[in-house]
């Protein structure tokens, strides 16, 4: 994502997509959803539920990623945490005292998942190679080389968008690309005549990832 967008965060894209849906669908509900996301809604605690150190997204991905990776350290009692939530008189999310240990376990679980899964050397190595593939593809397209890719991916590779470039056309192309598209082109690019691109794609698809080396501080 960062290779396609320059200085544009995932949240920026989310807001633009929501506003696009708001224009298409209309209605007060969609407008309220955008206001909550941008923290403009008068009930401020609703924004905390979707964007904070203990929001619904984090509660979801810890359990989900624990299940799919087999790392049991990320399992948290989300039902218990939600049950202990309440709203203070000044409109902030707070927790009952008896829910303290559940919140503490969530914090520890999140830290453990970062060390064991999200910052694992294999995950970082694969991410490094994937970003290198996109950067190399962008360089080759700038040089005029033709690479096999879906039209929407070619559109994204041919320009690195700034915030001012994110219009409806860009969003349409951006949202039409999914993981299967990326894996498909990575496998096709193995056979390209550019050595760097071919090498990186082969390394990722055949799981020949770079080795990690610890350096002294």
Task: Place the predicted regions along the sequence by residue.
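Histidine-centered, transition-metal-coordinating active-site segments
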Residues: 2-217
